[in-house]
């Protein structure tokens, strides 16, 4: 099995299109995933993506809840990680769950913008209104 993509279109392919589609869906699920009335962001994103100076930008991605914009900025060298999330207020999820892990596994001393679950590293926002600003301080 090879999990690679052709650079050009051919009439025949040794690659299976469902495998290629699954690769794209799995990449999407790293960044965002819907589960009933919950939107999960960065559910399995690697800790290295949250190293000092790193950033994650999702602009206009499509979901069951409509268009999503999400932005993460890591300033762990200065002691914090920030995230903002917006989505269509008419189609918003009931619960927004944003995972913002510290690259070295530290737990925040202060969280604004939601309630923090130390076990899962989720910031949970109940009754999400379509906009969120989150800050974790270490």
Positions of PLM-derived features:
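Non-catalytic C-terminal accessory modules of carbohydrate-active enzymes
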Residues: 1-138
